[in-house]
């Protein structure tokens, strides 16, 4: 499978207004569809379908397919094709305003066998729309080359599929120089995700597949620079797990690191044109880890990054706005060297007890607002916060809760919190602050 370039329209190429342009457009889009499984190329080609286009294939001879049916046929064929070679275009007529064209290639199938493919089409100039429109498409191929039995394995080789995902992420959506992404770009990626996929995005509410696609489109629409793309995969029983990370630069030059986990499995797809069920590789689980700020700040400002995240995620648990609230808060702590206390004077607890205690805090309160932040040392992220909390009762009486935090920067340059203390009584505040001062900072 070759790397797929954006469709001609996205490249700024004009509508075809003569037979040469139409022949080139048909080939470019068909290669993108069959060799790259690109929905964007299909949508581009469909812009030049006549309203009364006739589409005939060897799967259902004698019946014209609708445009959605045609797209499904192409999806099926591209699932079987692994790679196209010897691509050629020609025509049987030589007229600037009309073309009777032929598009041929050699394809290697998922069974590693080579076979020839041929498409013919007719198109003519529409002077009202000032572009060529395709009136007829015919796939007169011998359909017996395609699998006719329900396979026990997907049509597409898994290595080919994983490479396709890598190419789509690294060279399609998150290009080093950036690209003006549209919803359509991410909708195409959504075609590779099951409709009932589980989507977990840190700091966001639970969302379905369509909401996730819109989320990605909105988040990355105006990003102009990506760097350090990393793609890895491991086999997990019969499934595969993909980890993809990218660093993106915001308009204010702040740099963030996003990491996604995609779990892939074999999923059934019904192909009505020959009444068969086939298996495809599909993403059925998506996890987006909490975004990491990787900007190189001056030392005096460095700790403000973790300060803001701690306070936001602490309140996020109580406000209940985050689908993965607890994990996003726990991710800020060092699992191996965290000590914390629910009250000064009580026995210090370790990392594995944070979740249990925060469950009690969340059950007690319904709303959280940061009232005051007292900074002792931003270089070491040493600060305490007063949270104004509303009780989870009908009266919603308010209480203040003081919590102190201390952190450090690990060898990878990431901030981690390793000290946290809850102040329970006003009379202990001085002792509370003294304890924070005496905490041994990890540098």
UniProtKB/Swiss-Prot annotation:
InterPro entries in the record? DUF5382_C, DUF5382_central, DUF5382_N
Q: Where is the composition biased (Polar residues)?
A: 10-20
Q: Which Pfam families match?
A: DUF5382, DUF5382_C, DUF5382_N
Extract the ranges annotated as region (Disordered): 1-21
**Superkingdom of source:** Eukaryota
Name of this protein: Uncharacterized protein B0228.9
Protein source organism? Caenorhabditis elegans
């Amino acid at each position: 499978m070759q790397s797929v370039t954006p469709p001609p329209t996205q490249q700024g190429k004009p509508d075809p207004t003569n037979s040469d342009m139409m022949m080139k457009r048909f080939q470019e889009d068909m290669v993108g569809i069959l060799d790259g499984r690109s929905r964007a190329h299909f949508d581009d080609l469909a812009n030049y379908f006549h309203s009364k286009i006739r589409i005939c294939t060897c799967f259902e001879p004698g019946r014209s397919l609708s445009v959605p049916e045609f797209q499904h046929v192409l999806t099926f064929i591209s699932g079987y094709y692994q790679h196209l070679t010897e691509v050629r275009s020609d025509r049987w007529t030589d007229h600037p305003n009309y073309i009777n064209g032929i598009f041929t290639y050699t394809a290697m199938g998922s069974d590693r066998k080579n076979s020839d493919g041929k498409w013919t089409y007719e198109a003519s100039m529409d002077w009202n729309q000032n572009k060529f429109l395709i009136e007829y498409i015919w796939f007169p191929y011998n359909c017996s080359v395609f699998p006719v039995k329900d396979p026990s394995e997907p049509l597409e080789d898994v290595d080919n599929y994983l490479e396709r995902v890598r190419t789509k992420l690294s060279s399609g959506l998150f290009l080093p120089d950036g690209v003006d992404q549209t919803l359509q770009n991410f909708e195409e990626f959504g075609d590779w995700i099951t409709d009932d996929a589980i989507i977990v995005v840190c700091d966001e509410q639970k969302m379905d597949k369509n909401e996730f696609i819109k989320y990605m489109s909105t988040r990355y629409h105006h990003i102009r620079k990506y760097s350090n793309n990393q793609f890895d995969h491991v086999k997990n029983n019969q499934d595969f797990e993909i980890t993809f990370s990218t660093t993106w630069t915001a308009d204010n030059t702040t740099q963030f690191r996003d990491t996604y986990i995609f779990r892939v499995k074999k999923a059934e797809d019904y192909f009505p044109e020959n009444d068969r069920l086939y298996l495809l590789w599909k993403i059925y689980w998506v996890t987006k880890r909490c975004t990491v700020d990787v900007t190189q700040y001056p030392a005096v400002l460095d700790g403000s990054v973790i300060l803001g995240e701690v306070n936001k995620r602490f309140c996020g648990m109580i406000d209940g706005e985050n689908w993965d609230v607890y994990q996003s808060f726990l991710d800020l702590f060092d699992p191996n060297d965290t000590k914390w206390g629910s009250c000064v004077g009580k026995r210090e607890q370790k990392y594995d007890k944070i979740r249990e205690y925060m469950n009690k805090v969340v059950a007690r309160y319904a709303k959280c607002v940061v009232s005051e932040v007292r900074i002792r040392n931003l270089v070491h992220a040493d600060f305490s916060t007063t949270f104004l909390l509303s009780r989870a009762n009908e009266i919603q009486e308010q209480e203040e809760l003081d919590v102190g935090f201390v952190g450090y920067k690990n060898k990878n340059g990431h901030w981690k919190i390793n000290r946290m203390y809850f102040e329970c009584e006003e009379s202990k505040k001085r002792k509370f602050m003294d304890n924070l001062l005496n905490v041994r900072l990890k540098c």
